[in-house]
Amino acid sequence: VSFYTSENSPLEDFFSTNPNSITTRVNGTVFDNQGNLWITDALAINKLKKLSPGGSWKSFDLRSLQTNSAQEVNMIQIDKSNSLWIGTRRNGVYVYNENGDRKRALTTESTKGSLPHANVRTVAIDNNNRVWLGTQSGLVTYNNASGIFDATIYDADPIIILDDGIPKKLLGDQTINTIAIDGADNKWFGTDNGGVLYTNPNGQNTLASFNKDN
């Protein structure tokens, strides 16, 4: 078992004035297909870290993507092109690929993400390489993960369902805290006030809904 802190790794304390306290905040980890462990060092200067299978570290500076002073990064996922998708507290979602040092941010701005909220709390990537983003004000998906760095317009889209014949956004403006994808590619959404919603792979059919009453 290994235990990494700012004393023996590039992980950073955000309260460096207190030498007796560990204040490193890691909000997400994911392995790539080469066995590298990618880490979101939430309040660090270099917020993205990589630990190789051989034990070497590398840090990445994503500050060029930041548009809001609330700098914290949240969870991290990796798509089939080895691009990393990183949710942030107030800066949308960062996308990074080490091959070519490519970076991009999806924000609330039209044509540059059109996210319903800049607080992206959860990220999930399904079997079709579709990216699901849970924000403070609703759910959106991004369908062109492999082309994210080349697209001139890269808006995410809500899932539109029919409710008694009326088009509505799946989960409306609810806060989505977590998204899980099971082996059948079905989706599980954990919300702030609406319990858990379980849908088929494309989100069009609700398979179950769980709350305090059931």
Placement of each model-derived feature along the sequence:
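Carboxylate-rich, polar loop motifs that coordinate divalent cations or form catalytic acidic clusters
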Residues: V1-N214
